[in-house]
């Protein structure tokens, strides 16, 4: 744990000028290392412990990370239950592209009366939120029938991030990619 804290502190841009120091002899009896941050004078104490052995006789604790299920939302906090049809376009040079999501009879129409208006298009996963305000509704006989949302990717980095979201979303919802 101490090594992790030290690595985080050293890797932080705030503590780029960290200086190792020894504690006074009268402190807790053993040498320790202190990293000082230039941010508000806050210091982080990292006590040295016995080096970890490579072979442990007892089971160690395992860290379990829970990942958020990928979701699409039109109203923040309310997941869209309808699975969309997604079309992708990409420029020849690969620098930009557009994803067009079509939701036929989306569940947001059922809940928008209680929860409020559609505020945008939000794709949420464990990396964060991708969002767009390019959302339009199609009406049939005066009633909302479908929603079309566009997400524009202007850089290869945005394209890669979108593809990571779509991979997670498709795995969670049983979708597959069909190239046409």
UniProtKB/Swiss-Prot annotation:
In the UniProt record, which is one GO cellular component term?
photosystem II oxygen evolving complex
The primary location reported for this protein is: plastid
Entries under InterPro entries matching the protein: Psb28_c1_sf, PSII_Psb28_class-1
GO BP terms, alphabetized: photosynthesis
Localization per record: Plastid, Chloroplast thylakoid membrane
**Thylakoid recorded as keyword:** yes
Q: Which positions form the organelle transit peptide?
A: 1-64
**Could you tell me the keywords of this UniProt record?**
Chloroplast, Membrane, Photosynthesis, Photosystem II, Plastid, Thylakoid, Transit peptide
What does the record note on quaternary structure? Part of the photosystem II complex.
NCBIfam families for the chain: PS_II_psb28
Q: Which family does it belong to?
A: Belongs to the Psb28 family.
Name used for this protein in its record: Photosystem II reaction center PSB28 protein, chloroplastic
């Amino acid at each position: 744990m101490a090594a992790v804290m030290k690595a985080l502190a050293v890797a932080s841009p705030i503590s780029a000028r960290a200086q190792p120091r020894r504690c006074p002899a009268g402190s807790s009896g053993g040498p320790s290392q202190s990293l000082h941050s230039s941010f508000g004078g806050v210091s982080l104490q990292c006590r040295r412990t016995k080096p970890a052995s490579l072979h442990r006789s007892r089971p160690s604790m395992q860290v379990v990370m829970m990942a958020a299920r990928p979701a699409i939302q039109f109203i923040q906090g309310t997941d869209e239950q309808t699975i969309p049809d997604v079309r992708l376009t990409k420029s020849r040079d690969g620098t930009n592209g557009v994803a067009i999501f079509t939701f036929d009879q989306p569940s947001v129409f059922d809940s928008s009366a209680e929860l409020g208006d559609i505020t945008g298009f939000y794709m949420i996963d464990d990396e964060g939120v991708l969002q767009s305000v390019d959302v339009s509704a199609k009406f049939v006989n005066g009633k909302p029938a479908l929603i079309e949302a566009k997400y524009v990717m202007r850089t290869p980095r945005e394209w890669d991030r979108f593809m990571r979201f779509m991979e997670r979303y498709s795995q969670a919802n049983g979708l597959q990619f069909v190239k046409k």
